From Swiss-Prot:
The modification N6-acetyllysine is found at residues 7, 28-29. Belongs to the histone H2B family. Gene3D superfamilies: Histone, subunit A. Ubiquitous. Highest level in shoots, fruits and young flower buds, including petals, anthers and ovules. This is Histone H2B.2. Its main location: nucleus. It comes from Solanum lycopersicum. Can be acetylated to form H2BK6ac, H2BK33ac and H2BK34ac. Monoubiquitinated to form H2BK143ub1; may give a specific tag for epigenetic transcriptional activation. Pfam families: Histone (PF00125). The keyword Ubl conjugation applies. One of its GO terms (cellular component) is nucleus. There is a cross-link at residue 136 (Glycyl lysine isopeptide (Lys-Gly) (interchain with G-Cter in ubiquitin)). Signal peptide: none annotated. The nucleosome is a histone octamer containing two molecules each of H2A, H2B, H3 and H4 assembled in one H3-H4 heterotetramer and two H2A-H2B heterodimers. The octamer wraps approximately 147 bp of DNA.
Length: 140
């Protein structure tokens, strides 16, 4: 283990020297740096992807009503609605797992959470669709 400790300070010293060399140059902008910053601007354009349900909402809308569109404001509302329902189901299934002293959330906890969170007929349809999806997933 002692040789590893000796190698690390040896690696840090040249890096520190390089940093010391780079700091005075940081004030100056060389033509090479300005050219590379143009490439950096292109990289900055690609923002961090935000996960939304917008694509899936649109696909379901087209399955149900092919001739109807949706505004971006309405899409945002639907997206936040789905996020809210997802969060409620996750909290409820987590609570159920904790009550039953189970370390994992299984499909049973999810199904019970759906029955508790969603009202009446909606819960029945959600459970049947969920069961169908789980069966399809396990069979393939």
């Amino acid at each position: 283990m002692a040789p590893k400790a000796e190698k690390k300070p040896a690696e840090k010293k040249p890096a520190e020297e390089k940093k010391a060399e780079k700091t005075p140059k940081a004030g100056k902008k060389l033509p090479k740096e300005s050219g590379s910053s143009g490439a950096d601007k292109k990289k900055k354009k690609s923002k961090k992807s935000i996960e939304t349900y917008k694509i899936y909402i649109f696909k379901v809308l087209k399955q149900v009503h092919p001739d109807i569109g949706i505004s971006s404001k309405s899409m945002g509302i639907m997206n936040s609605f789905i996020n809210d329902i997802f969060e409620k189901l996750a909290q409820e299934s987590s609570r159920l797992a904790r009550i039953n002293k189970k370390p994992t959330i299984t499909s049973r906890e999810i199904q019970t959470a759906v029955r508790l969170v969603l009202p009446g007929e909606l819960a029945k349809h959600a459970v049947s669709e969920g069961t169908k999806a789980v069966t399809k997933f396990t069979s393939s």
